[in-house]
C-alpha cells in the first residue's frame, strides 16, 4: 500500500529571524482549521515542511490538496508518497506511484535532495539510480536532463523518503493573522474583493465592512456582497462582515450639502465608520480598492481629503494597477462572476453630475459642517448587522 502524503513547503516564513516560530504557529493553526472542515488528518511541521497524512480511509486527500493550494504562507503543495530510506524501495515506489505520469511523458529526469546526510548515497547518485530503474521500467520515456516533460523529485528526510512529480505552486504570501487585523471596505464591484485578497495575502486578518442603502439598493445587492465575502473565505479564512445601514447618512448629505461634494462627504463618512469598527475590533488599518485616476473620487486630492478623517493607515493595494490586471486576479480567485452581477451598490446612489476631482480639504470640511457628523456615525454603527462567514 502506497503511503499517500501531502508536503507543504513554506514560503517567506523561512526568511524570518527570531519571530519565525510565531509565523509557523499561525500557519499550522490555519492549516489545521482548514483541514477540520474536510475530515480527519495528521498535520505536523519539520524542517520548514508541513506534512499532512490521512488518518483513515475517510480522509479525502484530494480535497485536502485542493484546500492547501489556497492557504497563504506556502510556496508549493506536493502530492507525494513515502517509504523507508532505502534506494531500492525508493525506486520501487517511484515506479509504482508515478506510473501514470511516466506513461504520459515522453521524457523525464530525476532530482534528489537529502536533508538526512547520513543516507549512504549522494543526491546525484540517488537520482541516477532511481532514474535508471525508471528508464528500465518505462523504456518509451527517454531520459532528458536538460528539458524533460516530467521531473521526478526525490527527497530523503529525517523520517522517511518521499517521491513526487512537479510541485503545484502555493498561494504564497504570509499566514493570515500573522500581521494583525484590518477592516476592508467591500462593495459589490470587481476591485474591493481583489484588494481584500491582496492584503490577506500579506498575512492580515480582515473584517469586511459593507455600506447598505436600502431601499435605494436592493436586498439582492446586499446578498451579492455577502456572497463575495464568502468566496473570499477560501483564502482569507473565517470572516464576519459588518453591514452598515447607510441610507440616513446619504439622505442627509443630499438634503443639506452641495451636490458637487456628495461623493467626497460620503467617502469621509465611510472612513469614520470604518475607524469606529476598527477600534472596536483591534484593527490597525483600513483597506480600500481605490485605483489612482480610475474614477473622479480617486484623484490624489480626493483621496487625501477622504483619508484626512482617519488616524489609521489606509492600505490601497490596487493603486497602480490597470483594470485588466485587477480583472485577471478577480478571475483567478473566483470573485469576478459574482462582482459583475447587475446589482447596484451605495456608491451609485445620489451620484453628483459634476463631482469635485481636485477638492481642497477646507472646502470639503465647510461643505459637510452643516451635518451632525458624530450623531450620524454613532447611529450607523449602532445599527450594523454582523454576518459570520466560513468556507463551505
Predicted regions and their residues:
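Conserved G/P- and acidic residue-centered "switch" motifs that form tight phosphate/ATP-binding loops
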Residues: 189
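A conserved beta-strand->alpha-helix junction
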Residues: 229-255, 343-346
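General small-molecule cofactor/ligand-binding pocket signal
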Residues: 144, 242-244, 315
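RNA-binding accessory domains that recognize and position tRNA/RNA substrates
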Residues: 1-183, 193-239, 308, 356-361, ...
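The feature marks non-catalytic terminal segments
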Residues: 341-392
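Active-site adenylate/phosphate-handling loop in enzymes that bind or generate adenylated species
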Residues: 129-134, 167-179, 246, 250-251, ...
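A short alpha-helix-loop-beta-strand transition element characteristic
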Residues: 334-342
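Generic beta-strand/beta-sheet core signal
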Residues: 9, 164-166, 209-211, 244-247, ...
Amino acid at each position: 500500500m502506497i503511503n499517500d502524503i501531502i508536503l507543504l513547503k513554506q514560503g517567506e516564513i523561512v526568511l524570518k529571524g527570531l519571530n519565525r516560530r510565531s509565523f509557523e504557529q499561525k500557519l499550522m493553526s490555519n492549516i489545521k482549521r482548514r483541514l477540520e472542515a474536510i475530515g480527519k488528518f495528521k498535520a505536523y511541521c519539520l524542517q520548514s515542511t508541513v506534512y499532512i497524512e490521512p488518518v483513515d480511509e475517510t480522509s479525502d486527500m484530494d480535497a485536502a490538496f485542493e484546500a492547501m493550494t489556497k492557504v497563504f504562507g506556502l510556496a508549493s503543495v506536493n502530492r507525494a508518497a513515502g517509504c523507508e530510506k532505502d534506494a531500492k524501495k525508493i525506486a520501487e515506489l517511484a515506479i509504482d506511484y508515478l506510473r501514470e505520469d511516466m506513461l504520459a511523458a515522453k521524457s523525464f529526469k530525476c532530482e534528489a535532495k537529502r536533508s538526512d546526510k547520513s543516507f549512504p548515497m549522494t543526491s546525484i547518485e540517488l537520482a541516477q539510480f532511481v532514474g535508471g530503474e525508471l528508464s528500465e521500467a518505462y523504456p518509451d520515456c527517454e531520459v532528458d536532463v536538460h528539458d524533460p516533460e516530467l521531473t521526478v523529485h526525490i527527497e530523503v528526510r529525517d523520517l522517511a523518503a518521499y517521491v513526487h512529480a512537479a510541485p503545484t505552486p502555493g498561494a504564497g504570501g504570509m499566514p493570515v493573522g500573522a500581521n494583525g487585523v484590518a477592516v476592508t471596505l467591500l462593495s459589490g464591484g470587481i476591485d474591493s474583493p481583489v484588494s481584500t485578497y491582496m492584503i490577506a495575502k500579506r498575512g492580515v486578518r480582515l473584517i469586511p465592512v459593507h455600506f447598505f442603502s436600502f431601499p435605494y439598493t436592493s436586498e439582492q445587492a446586499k446578498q451579492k456582497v455577502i456572497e463575495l465575502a464568502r468566496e473570499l473565505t477560501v483564502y482569507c479564512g473565517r470572516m464576519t462582515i459588518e453591514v452598515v445601514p447607510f441610507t440616513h447618512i446619504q439622505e442627509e448629505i443630499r438634503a443639506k450639502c452641495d451636490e458637487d461634494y456628495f461623493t467626497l462627504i460620503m467617502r469621509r463618512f465611510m472612513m469614520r465608520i470604518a475607524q469606529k469598527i476598527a477600534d472596536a475590533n483591534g484593527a490597525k488599518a483600513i483597506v480600500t480598492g481605490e485605483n489612482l485616476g480610475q474614477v473622479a473620487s480617486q484623484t490624489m486630492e480626493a483621496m487625501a481629503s477622504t483619508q484626512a478623517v482617519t488616524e489609521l493607515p489606509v492600505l490601497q493595494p490596487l493603486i497602480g494597477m490597470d483594470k485588466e490586471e485587477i480583472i485577471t486576479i478577480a478571475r483567478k480567485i473566483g470573485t469576478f462572476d459574482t462582482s459583475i452581477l447587475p446589482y447596484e451598490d451605495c456608491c451609485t446612489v445620489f451620484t453628483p453630475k459634476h463631482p469635485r476631482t481636485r477638492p481642497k480639504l477646507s472646502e470639503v470640511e465647510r461643505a459637510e459642517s452643516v451635518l451632525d457628523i458624530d450623531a450620524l456615525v454613532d447611529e450607523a454603527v449602532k445599527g450594523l448587522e454582523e454576518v459570520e462567514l466560513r468556507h463551505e
